[in-house]
Amino acid sequence: MAHYISLFVRAVFVENMALAFFLGMCTFLAVSKKVSTASGLGVAVTVVLGLAVPINNLVYNLVLRDGALVEGVDLSFLNFITFIGVIAALVQILEMILDKYFPALYNALGIFLPLIAVNCAIFGGVSFMVQRDYNFPESIVYGFGSGIGWMLAIVAMAGIREKMKYANVPAGLRGLGITFITTGLMALGFMSFSGVQL
């Protein structure tokens, strides 16, 4: 149990997708203007990561890995296309659910919801799972931990950006300029976790 808690904390803080690996920055910067929208996207990314990583773990270990289907047959060259297909299918299912049951959030996310399918944070989580050879329970913990870490980062950024509306920011830094600086400072804060051994 301690191993899974350690993996979860490492995925949320030490190896944060947004602030340690800078994955998913396009949606991170574009949707982090309001806390409500950022938290909605954060939940959507957490759900997709939490499902995509373990499902792709099963696909990789049962179908694509060397000798998984037939001894001596290695289908791992199909990793990327298969992982992208699974992620795209999950995003489509999530999009249909949000459209039917949460139309306000669906409209607030707009074009960024389909872009979750090509969000590099999700593909990065799946790639790290394969690279680190996580088993199925580890992939569940890592997927949800990575999603919660990304959601923590985007909600914190949205809260800071809402407060910065009332700050006296120099004209040349307004908009994305101060957002990039703030993201860098947040990343420096998360770097303090890098020495933690779990």
Swiss-Prot record:
A single BP term in Gene Ontology: sodium ion transport
EC number(s) on file: 7.2.1.1
Keywords carried by this UniProt record: Cell inner membrane, Cell membrane, Ion transport, Membrane, NAD, Sodium, Sodium transport, Translocase, Transmembrane, Transmembrane helix, Transport, Ubiquinone
Places the protein is found: Cell inner membrane
UniProt topology in membrane: Multi-pass membrane protein
GO molecular function: oxidoreductase activity, acting on NAD(P)H, quinone or similar compound as acceptor
Transmembrane segments: 11-31, 35-55, 77-97, 110-130, 140-160, 176-196
Entry similarity comment: Belongs to the NqrDE/RnfAE family.
Quaternary state and interactors: Composed of six subunits; NqrA, NqrB, NqrC, NqrD, NqrE and NqrF.
Function: NQR complex catalyzes the reduction of ubiquinone-1 to ubiquinol by two successive reactions, coupled with the transport of Na(+) ions from the cytoplasm to the periplasm. NqrA to NqrE are probably involved in the second step, the conversion of ubisemiquinone to ubiquinol.
Protein name: Na(+)-translocating NADH-quinone reductase subunit E
Upper taxonomic lineage: Bacteria, Pseudomonadati, Pseudomonadota, Gammaproteobacteria, Enterobacterales
